[in-house]
């Protein structure tokens, strides 16, 4: 009897059938909550009178807290089980929502993002591992689609609430809080997917755990992975302000739509290409990401929202397929008790790429403006994509030579 069978047999048949859907929805909720503040940054900036640099700091502390969480508790669900860790993560995210609701200045926002980041880090590795436990092939696809879908829902949903509903700095967090409470209750009706094992205290020692059999693949994918997450970080921190400044559109839904276009396109493309092999999706992803970035730059320079959205949709397709290829390339290489640790290592690399370039972009935008910052950022991403192509070709040549 496998670990999954032994733990799941004590649960209801309904719980077993709904487990993948529940974990996917919970993952989407965490990432929707993480992107929900993005359309509110300009409102916060006006209400609390802070600079674009502080916007990126508020954005980035979330990622840094998430990294700390991954380093310390990223593998903890391999020892305690998936459900207890996800439950505590849901409770922590509720605390973050409460801090957002009470925020009356940037310090409250920073505190909320720190708690939210730690909660999301613990949840991301545990939920991701649970999905792969249930079905390695489908789990890898879901691990790609759910976060992207969640970020799109968070950005677009918040934008709509800001534009059409009252109390924009309150309502979105109240709605999210209700969802988190419901999921914290429902988690106990869902089957556990792994057995507890020894080594809990040792697992709390901060370290990046990449199984030897996955190291070469992860290294070859690193430049493209950095490019993917750097693009996502730029969108989720500065793009609403970029759209407003360069196009003159102040409607929150416009900026939110541009952000959502990236993740909606990414999630859709992941679903459409879910049965393709990683090499095929990488080729498509690299091509579309390059074309999309060039189109985005053109849209910024001619100050046309439709062109900007078109470029974003194209780049999003590249982002999603590259993300899918990375997850599908590395996760099957790990043993069941290595999955949470490997996923943590992948997310650490990803979220450093998500946050550090965005902070630099915040300083650049203050110094040279949003248009010039976009140009510099685009060049950097294209250079990373180019170096990634070279790294992948070199890796394939080594594999052929070793056969």
Annotate each predicted stretch with a short phrase:
Residues 112-147:
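Cytoplasmic helix-loop-helix junction between adjacent transmembrane helices
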Residues 254-278, 292:
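Transmembrane alpha-helices of Major Facilitator/SLC transporters
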Residues 319, 327-378, 388:
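A late C-terminal transmembrane helix in Major Facilitator Superfamily
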Residues 138, 142-188:
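Helix-loop-helix hairpin linking two adjacent transmembrane segments in secondary transporters
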Residues 171-187, 374-391:
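Symmetry-related core transmembrane helices of the 12-TM Major Facilitator Superfamily/SLC fold
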Residues 280-326:
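C-terminal transmembrane helical hairpin of 12-TM major facilitator-type secondary transporters
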Residues 67-106:
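Conserved MFS/SLC helix-loop-helix module at the cytosolic interface between two early adjacent transmembrane helices
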Residues 49, 81, 102-107, 166, ...:
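Helix-breaking motifs and short loop linkers at transmembrane-helix boundaries and internal kinks
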């Amino acid at each position: 009897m496998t670990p999954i069978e032994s733990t799941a047999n004590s649960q209801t048949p309904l719980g077993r059938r709904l487990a993948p859907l529940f974990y996917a929805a919970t993952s989407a909720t965490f990432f929707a909550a993480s992107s929900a503040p993005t359309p509110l940054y300009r409102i916060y900036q006006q209400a609390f009178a802070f600079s674009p640099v502080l916007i990126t700091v508020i954005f980035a502390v979330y990622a840094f807290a998430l990294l700390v969480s991954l380093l310390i508790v990223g593998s903890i669900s391999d020892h305690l089980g998936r459900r207890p860790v996800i439950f505590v993560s849901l409770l922590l995210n509720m605390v973050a929502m409460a801090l957002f609701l009470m925020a009356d200045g940037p310090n409250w926002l920073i505190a909320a993002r720190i708690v939210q980041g730690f909660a999301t880090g613990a949840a991301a590795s545990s939920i991701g591992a649970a999905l792969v436990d249930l079905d390695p092939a489908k789990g890898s696809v879901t691990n790609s689609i759910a976060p992207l879908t969640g970020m799109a829902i968070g950005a677009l949903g918040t934008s709509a609430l800001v534009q059409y509903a009252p109390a924009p700095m309150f309502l979105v967090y109240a709605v999210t809080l209700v969802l988190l409470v419901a999921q914290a209750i429902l988690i106990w009706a869902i089957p556990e997917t792994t057995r507890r094992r020894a080594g809990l205290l040792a697992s709390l020692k901060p370290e990046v755990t990449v199984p030897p059999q996955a190291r070469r693949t992860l290294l070859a994918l690193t430049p493209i992975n950095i490019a993917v997450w750097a693009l996502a970080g730029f969108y989720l921190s500065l793009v609403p302000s970029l759209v407003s400044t360069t196009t003159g559109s102040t409607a929150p839904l416009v900026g939110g739509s541009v952000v959502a276009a990236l993740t909606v396109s990414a999630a859709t493309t992941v679903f459409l290409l879910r049965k393709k092999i990683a090499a095929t999706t990488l080729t498509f992803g690299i091509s579309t990401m390059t074309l999309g970035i060039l189109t985005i730059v053109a849209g910024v320079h001619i100050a046309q929202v439709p062109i900007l959205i078109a470029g974003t949709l194209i780049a999003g397709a590249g982002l999603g397929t590259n993300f899918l290829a990375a997850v599908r390339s590395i996760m099957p290489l790990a043993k069941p008790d290595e999955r949470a640790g490997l996923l943590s290592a992948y997310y650490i690399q990803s979220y450093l790429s998500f946050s550090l370039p965005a902070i630099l972009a915040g300083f650049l935008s203050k110094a040279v403006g949003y248009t010039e910052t976009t140009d510099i950022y685009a060049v950097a991403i294209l250079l990373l994509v180019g170096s990634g192509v070279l790294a992948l070709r070199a890796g394939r040549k080594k594999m052929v030579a070793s056969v």
